[in-house]
């Protein structure tokens, strides 16, 4: 997670919180002593890492939502990885698609859990 990643994201999304934007504030008020990443950025990067695996390439139809918990801060300089597990799948009324539930675990370079999520997606099915 680079400073550029954080600054670009907070400017793009309008995250005006001094914790993300103002290094003088960070130096004075943050318990971390360096810039923290918004949880939304951590989630977005995790989704990008998953997309890069090709796991759902060409099959994704819709992101249906889910639940996310921020467990620990992600700070400038951290390196992230994602573990993904299919925890449920079900057919829909339409034979060309199904609903898949994934559990995501985002870990930093010290293998500390920083974010966990349970996500549902509509996925294209192979037809017989």
Regions found by a protein language model. Name each.
Residues 70-128:
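HotDog/MaoC-like acyl-thioester-processing domains
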Residues 1-65, 128:
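Hot-dog-fold acyl-thioester-processing enzymes
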């Amino acid at each position: 997670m680079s400073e550029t990643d954080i600054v670009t994201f907070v400017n793009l999304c309008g995250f005006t919180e001094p914790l993300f934007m103002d290094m003088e504030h960070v130096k004075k008020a943050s318990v971390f002593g360096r810039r923290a990443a918004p949880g939304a950025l951590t989630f977005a990067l995790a989704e990008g890492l998953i997309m890069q695996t090709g796991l759902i390439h060409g099959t994704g139809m819709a992101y249906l939502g889910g639940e996310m918990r921020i467990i620990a801060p992600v700070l400038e300089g951290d390196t992230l990885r994602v573990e993904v597990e299919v925890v449920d799948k079900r057919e829909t009324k339409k034979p060309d698609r199904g609903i898949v539930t994934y559990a995501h675990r985002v870990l930093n370079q010290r293998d500390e859990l920083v974010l966990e999520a349970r996500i549902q997606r509509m996925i294209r099915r192979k037809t017989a």
